[in-house]
């Protein structure tokens, strides 16, 4: 089964077998993978993985990509983090070309930069459970028709994903403040 579009897989500091596992999971569904090894850009992390799926985040993604492939990628990311330890571990960016079923078009990015192994694992584990929550959370931001990107961060204190920042085509940025549940425009 081949889905439309090309998946993106950029990385640094990961082993050949890790590259092969992620690449084959993406290629098996999307057919084409934009793979790129980057120079180390952040000395705080020995490894970085960025995966961009060419379909929107939602139930349809998990049907097309399959839970088996999703579990394989999740398991690999968690194992990479465990092997590299907490101090200089792994950062991961998992992104989608929109949010389904509402046809929300901004790129959705899950940014996983937790230093603590357990929090990293919990963040990865909880992504699939956000399918019904994210469309509701999007309502806190101004109109999504000119929103280009929304970034989610994992909150280690409250053990949940929160919207962090939304970027708009006019250059404006909104930051969500989870403690006060307010938006701040930058």
Named regions from a protein language model:
Residues 1-47, 71-186:
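Short amphipathic alpha-helical segments that predominantly mediate membrane engagement
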Residues 55-72:
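Short hydrophobic alpha-helical membrane-entry/anchor segments
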